């Protein structure tokens, strides 16, 4: 077994349509840190799904629903830390506003 500490999702702006931002391709992934920053001048929301292989993002795998970040607020999502994605599982996000929230996810990949 090999464990690699890595950036699962490089810093990027969350889309305002449901979007896959990471897939555990051939690995088991463990989320260690998930950070979101609202860089806009007004409040904005973000939702996060952890979806099993072959699944579709929806209410059954919604972990964080419409978390409101105030202008310039950063949030580190303790509710996501320690979650495991089996091979083929993925992280999907949905921002309520375009061009408002940046995300970055770090963790471990196990092969």
Tell what function each PLM region has.
Residues 53-90:
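Intrinsically disordered, low-complexity Pro/Gly/Ser/Thr-rich segments with frequent PxxP/GP/PP motifs
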Residues 30-32, 44, 73, 87-89, ...:
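A generic structural signal for short beta-strands and their flanking turns/coil linkers
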Residues 17-18, 40, 51, 61-63:
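Intrinsic disorder/low-complexity detector
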């Amino acid at each position: 077994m090999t464990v690699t500490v890595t950036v699962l999702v490089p810093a990027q702006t969350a889309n305002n349509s449901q979007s896959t931002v990471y897939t555990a391709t051939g690995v088991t992934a463990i989320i260690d840190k998930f950070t979101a920053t609202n860089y806009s001048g007004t409040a904005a929301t973000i939702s996060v799904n952890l979806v099993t292989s072959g699944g579709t993002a929806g209410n059954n795998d919604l972990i964080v629903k419409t978390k409101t970040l105030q202008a310039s607020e950063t949030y580190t999502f303790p509710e996501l830390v320690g979650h495991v994605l089996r091979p083929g599982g993925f992280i999907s996000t949905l921002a309520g506003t375009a061009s408002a929230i940046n995300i970055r996810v770090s963790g471990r990949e196990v092969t």
